[in-house]
């Protein structure tokens, strides 16, 4: 079930933390530190029972020690809190390079062996566990999807808070302690992530506890937050809306049990405050709380040798990765490593058979409350299919009555109505995210059934529209936050969509890349991770109709980023081009049913023609591309003089206008529309692509193909390089030309306008025969541009064109091309 309630959340402890638990946490810390070092350094003899030699050390030492002991300490206490309070909890490890802590945790709580039975709970299993870490044929170095309990790898830094807050949305029983490295805190996404506390509601959402892991250093430099004054540091977090607590340890000779007692007491104080916030949220008190956060100030590399080779190591940047880089190569480093590992007294922590002693784990949670077993961290286990409304009720039916090419419809408005009713049917498992663009991208029908969630004060109904402390729409002007919120919402079993201006999807190129890698690893080799809902991204306000914002807003290149993920038959990315509103609806339905994908859906928001019916759309979407027989005039491929192909709404509009003119000249052509770009890829590279036989039948085996493409032409060239007839393809795409100008001028400067396409088609057929017509078309392009320069709007021959199949009365004759009122939403 989605949003499961596990345990008895938000209950205060009615007694002090037991001394047995304190001792257990110290033993956990020691065993986790020992196992973390073992993962980085050892390939054999995991408990040093046999004579311990340099041959037991790995040849290549890979890993990060510096953050790991602090993470192990915190994990000990989080485990204790979960057990004592029976608190439903997911753990976020921002500094994911502390991966040894995460894998050690899941080994200690037993879930690692449950998912990987070959890693047994004995000396042989421990040796495999150590050896596999960052090793050929083994596991990665970070808190990767291979690790039970992880929903955040923490490889690319910056997204910890975005993922933490996305996980708690509509998940009121969930507690998410989120560890943030003080280096990560310098990244842009993390800096804005602090503001997430204004976008959640403690009544309907869970609670995030940010824990700043302030160990003072990055790879080779101090961290900014570690060097400002305590007053400035605390004031910063108060300004972000938090109540900061600070814990300092490891800089003197304080006994470790004393440190654990102090931290356990502080952790209970913090959790009591959280319980009070949750209790107050059930009353009529609507005041936004100052949520607690913890500054955890400890030495980098805590408990490692204080000096190595005469240089300060513990408490310095030198502890960041592998403090003893020559442990196999030099006796001096090896002896230091041996003494370091012996300092944790493994003989007190492991049984004779190599299993962990029961008194180490007695304080830890059991069953699904274990960090590695919580179903929220394997969201596919609790995911339920969306209750989707029938799509037919949203169809633009005018195309049936008035003909192909009818109307002036803003396609995303239809999607907005569809999302509205999805929210109605799934009120606590579907969200819409946007970087201040939900209305601009025409999804505002959602406000008919929900609000924008906002817990940051209200001024007046005159200016604060569609806002409430609870709602299924979340807006923050941060593409990072939108993508991060949605990813975590999906990773914990729910569904959603977010929209962005096309050019600014590039802001989160690398986030898409990271999520794709998570999905790739999952579908290749982690069968126990059940499929999660797909990232659905509406890419609107696109290059061809950004005429009111200009060159900076004109970049469709996210297609190229996603195409890099289409190999190996992992099938984790899709690129869809919605030709019209009906196409967009069918694409959305398919995407909302899909799992383990990143679905990029390209759809303009300006008024545009409706070309095909919903039934026609479904057939085309199934195939990925289709001939529009009603638009073709060639009866067979043998009769074709040129294939006119398009992907994208504006390229389709211009190809259709060109086809109208070519038809009047008697040119024989077929019209092909592409909706699912990746279906064009060679079937040798992609087993879901169309076959070479189908490709040749669609595009012909030997006729020239003029392909008008929404994005950069090299996308298509790269996809079809090994296809039949690929040498006969002429691809026209965005050529990095644009400005704040008119719709015609945008297509003109990129040779995408109908006149340029008509001329190019004639050139491909017989350049000499049609030389005069080609010159005439090129001259008209100059005339049309000059008209726009002189008048400030496009020439009527361009704006008044309507596809000849359209049958309308005088009151609805305005063409979609002429509907250029701009974007005032």
From Swiss-Prot:
Q: Which pairs of positions does the record mark as disulfide bonds?
A: none
| Catalytic activity as recorded in UniProt | D-xylulose 5-phosphate + phosphate = acetyl phosphate + D-glyceraldehyde 3-phosphate + H2O; keto-D-fructose 6-phosphate + phosphate = acetyl phosphate + D-erythrose 4-phosphate + H2O
Top-level taxon: Bacteria
What are the record keywords, sorted? Lyase, Thiamine pyrophosphate
Q: What is the E.C. number? A: 4.1.2.22, 4.1.2.9
* One record GO biological process: carbohydrate metabolic process
- Per UniProt, what is one Pfam family of this protein? XFP_N
Database matches in InterPro entries: Phosphoketolase, THDP-binding, Transketo_C/PFOR_II, Xul5P/Fru6P_PKetolase, Xul5P/Fru6P_PKetolase_C, Xul5P/Fru6P_PKetolase_CS, Xul5P/Fru6P_PKetolase_N, Xul5P/Fru6P_PKetolase_ThDP_BS
Which enzyme type, at the first EC level? Answer: lyase
Q: Which cofactor does it need?
A: thiamine diphosphate
Enumerate the GO terms in the molecular function aspect: fructose-6-phosphate phosphoketolase activity; magnesium ion binding; phosphoketolase activity
Q: Which family does it belong to?
A: Belongs to the XFP family.
Biological role stated in the UniProt entry:
Phosphoketolase using both fructose 6-phosphate and xylulose 5-phosphate as substrate.
Q: Which NCBIfam families match?
A: PRK05261.1-4, PRK05261.1-5
Assembly: Homohexamer.
This one is known as Xylulose-5-phosphate/fructose-6-phosphate phosphoketolase
- The gene that this protein is the product of is xfp
């Amino acid at each position: 079930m989605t949003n499961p309630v596990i345990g008895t959340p938000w209950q205060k402890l009615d007694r002090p933390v037991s001394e047995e638990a304190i001792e257990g946490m110290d033993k956990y810390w020691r065993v986790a530190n020992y196992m973390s070092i073992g993962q980085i350094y050892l390939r054999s003899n995991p408990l040093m029972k046999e004579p311990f030699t340099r041959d037991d050390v790995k040849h290549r030492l890979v890993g990060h020690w510096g953050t790991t002991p602090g993470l192990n300490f915190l994990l000990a206490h989080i485990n204790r809190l979960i057990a004592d309070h029976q608190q439903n909890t997911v753990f976020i490890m921002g500094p994911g390079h502390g991966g040894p802590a995460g894998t050690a945790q899941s080994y200690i709580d037993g879930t690692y062996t449950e998912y990987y039975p070959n890693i047994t709970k004995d000396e042989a299993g421990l040796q495999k566990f150590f050896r596999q870490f960052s090793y050929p044929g083994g596991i990665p170095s970070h808190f990767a999807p291979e690790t039970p309990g992880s929903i955040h790898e923490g490889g690319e830094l910056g997204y910890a808070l975005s993922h933490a807050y996305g996980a708690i949305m509509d998940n009121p029983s969930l507690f998410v302690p989120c560890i943030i490295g003080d280096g990560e805190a310098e990244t842009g996404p993390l800096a804005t992530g602090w503001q997430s506390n204004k976008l959640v509601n403690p009544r309907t959402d869970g609670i995030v506890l940010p824990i700043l892991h302030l160990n003072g250093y990055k790879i080779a430099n101090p961290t900014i937050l570690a060097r400002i004054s305590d007053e400035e540091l605390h004031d910063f977090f108060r300004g972000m809306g938090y109540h900061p607590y600070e814990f300092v340890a490891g800089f003197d000779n304080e006994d470790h049990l004393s440190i654990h007692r102090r931290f356990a007491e502080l952790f209970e104080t913090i959790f009591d405050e959280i319980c009070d916030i949750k209790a107050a949220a059930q009353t009529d008190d609507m005041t936004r709380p100052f949520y607690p956060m913890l500054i955890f100030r400890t030495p980098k590399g805590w408990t490692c040798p204080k000096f190595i080779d005469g240089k300060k190591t513990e408490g310095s940047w030198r502890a960041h990765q592998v403090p003893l880089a020559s442990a196999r190569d030099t006796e001096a480093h090896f002896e230091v490593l041996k003494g370091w590992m012996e300092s944790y007294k493994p003989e007190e922590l492991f049984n004779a058979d190599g299993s962990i002693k029961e008194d180490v784990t007695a304080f830890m949670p059991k069953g699904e409350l274990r960090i590695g077993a919580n179903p929220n961290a394997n969201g596919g286990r609790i995911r339920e299919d969306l209750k989707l409304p029938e799509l037919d009720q949203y169809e633009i039916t005018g195309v049936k009555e008035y003909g192909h090419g009818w109307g002036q419809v803003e396609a995303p408005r239809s999607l907005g109505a569809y999302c509205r009713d999805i929210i109605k049917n799934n009120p606590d498992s579907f969200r819409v995210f946007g970087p201040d663009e939900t209305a601009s991208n025409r999804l505002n029908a959602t406000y008919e059934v929900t609000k924008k969630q906002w817990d940051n004060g209200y001024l007046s109904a005159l200016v604060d529209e569609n806002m409430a402390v609870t709602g299924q729409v979340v807006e923050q002007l941060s593409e990072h936050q939108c993508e991060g919120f949605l990813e975590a919402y999906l990773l914990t079993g729910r569904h959603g969509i977010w929209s962005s201006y096309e050019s600014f999807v590039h802001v989160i190129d690398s986030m898409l890349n990271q999520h794709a890698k998570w999905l790739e690893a999952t579908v290749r080799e982690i069968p126990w991770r059940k499929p999660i809902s797909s990232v659905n991204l509406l890419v609107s306000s696109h290059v061809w109709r950004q005429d009111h914002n200009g060159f900076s807003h004109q970049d469709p290149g996210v297609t190229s980023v996603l195409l890099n993920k289409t190999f190996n038959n992992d099938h984790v990315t899709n690129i869809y081009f919605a030709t019209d509103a009906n196409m967009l609806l069918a694409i959305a339905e398919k995407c909302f049913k899909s799992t383990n994908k990143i679905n990029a859906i390209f759809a303009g928001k300006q008024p545009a023609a409706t070309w095909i019916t919903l039934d026609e759309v479904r057939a085309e979407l199934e195939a990925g591309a289709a001939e529009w027989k009603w638009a073709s005039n060639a009866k067979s491929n043998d009769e074709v003089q040129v294939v006119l192909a398009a992907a994208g709404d504006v390229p389709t509009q211009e190809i259709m206008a060109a086809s109208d003119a070519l038809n009047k000249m008697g040119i024989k052509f077929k019209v092909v529309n592409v909706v699912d770009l990746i279906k064009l890829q060679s079937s040798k590279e992609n087993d879901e692509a169309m076959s070479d036989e189908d490709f040749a039948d669609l595009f012909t085996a030997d006729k020239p193909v003029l392909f008008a493409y929404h994005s950069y032409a090299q996308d298509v060239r790269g996809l079809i390089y090994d296809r039949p007839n690929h040498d006969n393809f002429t691809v026209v795409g965005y050529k990095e030309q644009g400005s704040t100008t008119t719709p015609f001028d945008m297509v003109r400067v990129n040779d995408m306008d109908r006149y340029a396409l008509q001329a190019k088609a004639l050139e491909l057929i017989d350049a000499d025969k049609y030389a005069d017509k080609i010159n005439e078309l090129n001259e008209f392009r100059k005339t049309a541009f000059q008209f726009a320069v002189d008048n400030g709007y496009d020439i009527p021959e361009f704006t008044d064109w309507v596809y000849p199949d359209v049958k309308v009365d005088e009151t609805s004759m305005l063409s979609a091309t002429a509907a250029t009122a701009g974007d005032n939403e």
